[in-house]
C-alpha cells in the first residue's frame, strides 16, 4: 500500500494528480483500480473527478511494479492504441464512438476503446497528454459487446452524463440474436438480478433477495431464422450483464455468449463474441444551455453483421 499526502497549490482532479505522481496510471488503470476499491481519498472511495487539495490523504492498494511501469514503457498508453476510435458523433462536449466486439472499454492494456478515443482526439488536435482534463467514459459495455459508447470531452459533460445515465434518462436500445425464439415474440421481463462474484456472473431471480437489484428488460422480435431470433431490446434498468442474463433466464440466450449461452451452438457457428450490439442512444431533454443542442437527439451504430444474415435466413 502507498500513502500519498497531497501537496498542490490549487485544487486538482484526483485522476490528474495520480497521473502526475505515477505516469503509468493510465485512465484505464485508474478506472479499473477505482472499481476494485484500490483508491481511497481520505479513507473513502471517491470519483476520479473529485478535486484534491493540500493535506488530503490518498491510499493506493496497487502493486509497486504497476506504479513503476512507466520506467519500462515510453509515452502514454493511448499512443500505442492500434487505431483511432470509429466516431459516430463529435461535438465540443462529447464523443460517441462505435466499440468493436472484443475491445475492452478500458483496462491496463494499450488497445482499449478509451485509448483509441484519446488517439482520435490527439490526431484532431483536441487532446495532449499534459492536458488538465482527460476525456472519460460515461458508461461501459462488456468486452464482447459492440456498439455505442459516450465519452465526455469536458468535466461538465462527464458530470452531466454520469448523472443522466445513472438516473436512466438516456434511452439505450440494443440489437441481438438469441439461440431460441422467445415466446411471446414481444414482452417485458422483470425480476431481480443477483451477482455471483466468485463466478463472475449474475442470475435472474423472481423474488427479492439480499443484494439483489430489480431489473426490467423490454424486447421485440424483428425476425426469426431457423433456431434463431433477431431482437430489438430496450434496457429499462441498466445492470451488469442484464440483457444476457435476462434472455438466458427465459431459455433464449444471446448467440455467441460463452457465459450464459449455448456453447455447442456457439462452436457450431464459430462465434467468438456475443451477438449483442448497443445500437441506439436517445438523449433526454437538457436544460443546461451548453447541452440543449443535444436534447432529443438519437444516434445509431452501424447495424452488426448478423442483422442482415438473420433477415436473409443465411444465419440460422
Predicted regions and their residues:
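Short, surface-exposed secondary-structure edge patches
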Residues: 47-51, 232, 273
